[in-house]
Every structure is written in structure tokens, then in C-alpha cells.
Amino acid sequence: MKVLYFDCFSGISGDMILGALLDLGVNLEEWKNELNKIPVEGYKIEISKKQKNHIWGTDVEIIIEDHHSHRHLEDLLEIVDKSELSENIKNRAKEVFYKIAEAEAKIHNTSINEVHFHEVGALDTVIDVLGSLILLDMLKVDKIYSSPLPLGGGFVNASHGTIPVPAPATLEILRGVPVYRDGREGELVTPTGAAIISTIAEFVKILPPIKVDKVGYGCGKKDFPFPNLLRVYEGELIEKVIEEKNVVLETNIDDMNPQIFGYLTEKLFKEGALDVFLTPVYMKKGRPGVLLTVIAPLAMEEKLLEVIFGETTTLGVRRIYVDKRIMQREIREIETKWGKVRIKVANINGIKKAYPEYEDCKSIAERENIPLKDVIGEIEKIIERELEV
């Protein structure tokens, strides 16, 4: 399994992500061709090698012709929708922009549609977000990990005046993400960097064993007593079986409108749950009820607890910490009469399993107006024939 690990020892920002990923050796011209699919003008990109505390990295400078362009969320979503980028990149970009909009709206006590994007709406940030997601798509990795994030400290001057570090919007975006303070001063994590990394990565305190193939360094703009760099490892997981730490959240509910459970389930998945399921149970005094079970990464525990307490009638939630073992897996593409279809392939000690991606099968069924079961059945025959599963 091909993985990336973001080693954020000096924090993270949008331009640092671009620099580190380009430093891994991604084809620059191919990346620029993908950027041309974004319907925006008035910028140029300068890429150079720079030194931070005697460590060389890639610096990305996005130069904007008009520095007074401000946009709202709907403007950013329109740019994404009108681009010719893949649906996966578009969906991820929308997640990032929504995160920042929701954080800014909460801090400034307004709605997400009324937020005036002084930073986020700036063209350089649009390129930071979409450019980073394009690079990740080009790298074709199966899993992305990140270290906990250093918050920095002190104060910085912003368009609204002097604000504490981390910036309020940044800290709002980082809810549920492992962070730490170590006495360093300065803004180490930007809102854009926080939104991108919290969307794409799983945060781990201990990196699973990997064979490192490449290392990339992306330069930050400020100079600190320490190297202001983002380091990214590209490599292969060594273990056939992957171990993860998860939390299982459970609560019994017998006094809530059942219509709410559908909305609750969707919201829990949106906030980072790995699985959510409902089990009919009989409770005390013979009352029928529902056992809500949520499985999630440890980093998402507090955010999901907030959703459960906010959206249900429960007064308490049980927490069970578990180890999960996962078969090594990768995403491949196979040719079918309907075009390319992604399949998930897992393998351990000669045991091989492969399944077609549901969303690809669903799209074919809707486009061709044929039963979903026929699409899945046909693709499973191809998998069995070509992969000998």
C-alpha cells in the first residue's frame, strides 16, 4: 500500500503543502496542465529551491495581479463546479472550503453564505487548495497520515486587527484534531493548511512501519529559529495487516422520534465516523429502543460525542477503545464495456479479496439505465477472470 506521511514539525500551510508534494518529484508540466482546468486568471506561479536552516526545500510563490479580489463561498463553489477537474478533486475541494466557511461564520457570528473571504477567497488560496488536491491525485496514494499539529503562540496582525495564535478560525477548524503547544512563538498552522490536512489525512501519534521511498520538503514563508519546513514521506506500508486504534461509542435510546436517526447517521459519517449502525433492543420495562453504535478514529471522538449529545435525547455515551486490524488494500482500475471501474483489492498471506467500488457501479447503472445488480455481477466476473480472486 502506497502511503504519504505529513511530518508537520513546523506546522502546515497551503503553500508548504504545494512545495512538499512538488519536492517529491511530481511532473511539473502535468500539474500546470491540470491547473489550467480551473476557470480563473490573473496569477502566476514561481517555483524555486530555498534553504531553511541549511535544509533545502521547494518554495512555491503564487503571485496575484489583483490583490483586492474578495469572494464568498458560493463564488468558490462555482469555480470548483466549472472546473474540468475530476469529481473526486471537486468534492474534496468543497469539503475544504465549507470547513473554512463554517469556522469563519462561527467566529464572526454570521452565516456561511455571508462570510467575506478575505484570505480564503483570495486567488492564491484557491490555487493552494485545488493545486494540493491535484498533486495528491497525481501521486495516487492509498492512505495519507499526518502527525499532530503544533499550534505556535503569541499574536498576529490580521484584517480584523490583532488576534491570538492560533487564529480563532484555525482552532475552530482543528476541533477533533490532535494538537500541542511546545513554547514556540508565531503562527505555525494557517486556516487553509488546517482545512486541507484535516480533510485528507488520518492523524497518528505513531507512524505505522513504512519503507520510505521519497522525502519532500516544502518551504514556509516566515523565518524562525527552527527550519520552517513541511516534510512529507512517500513510501510503502511494511505490514500486511494494518493496526489502528479506534473508539466505539454506544448509547441506548428509547424516547426519540425515529425520523431523526437517518439525519443523525448522515451527520456522524460527515463528521468522520468510520461506521454507524442501529440495533433494535428491548430496554427496561419492556420498552423497545435503539442501540446506536459509532466506530471512529480516536481523533474524531470529541467531535462525534458533540454530535450525539446535540442531536439525540441521550444523557450518556459508553466509550470502548479497541484495536482494529485491517488487510492491506489498494485501489486499482479495470476495463469494462462501460469504461474504467475502480476496484478495491485486499491481500494477506495469499488470501485475496476484491470488490468493485459501489459509486462507480451506481454511476454506470444510472447512466446506462440497467439494474445495479447486473452491473456488479458483470464486474465481479471480470475480477474473478483477470485477478483470479
UniProtKB/Swiss-Prot annotation:
Keywords, sorted A to Z: Nickel
A Pfam family: Ni_insertion
Matching Gene3D superfamilies: mk0293 like domain, Transcriptional regulatory protein pf0864 domain like
Database matches in InterPro entries: Ni_insertion (IPR002822)
Transmembrane regions listed in the UniProt entry: none
Record GO terms (molecular function): lyase activity; nickel cation binding
Family: Belongs to the LarC family.
Cited PANTHER family: NICKEL INSERTION PROTEIN-RELATED, PYRIDINIUM-3,5-BISTHIOCARBOXYLIC ACID MONONUCLEOTIDE NICKEL INSERTION PROTEIN
Official protein name in the record: Putative nickel insertion protein
Species name: Dictyoglomus turgidum (strain DSM 6724 / Z-1310)
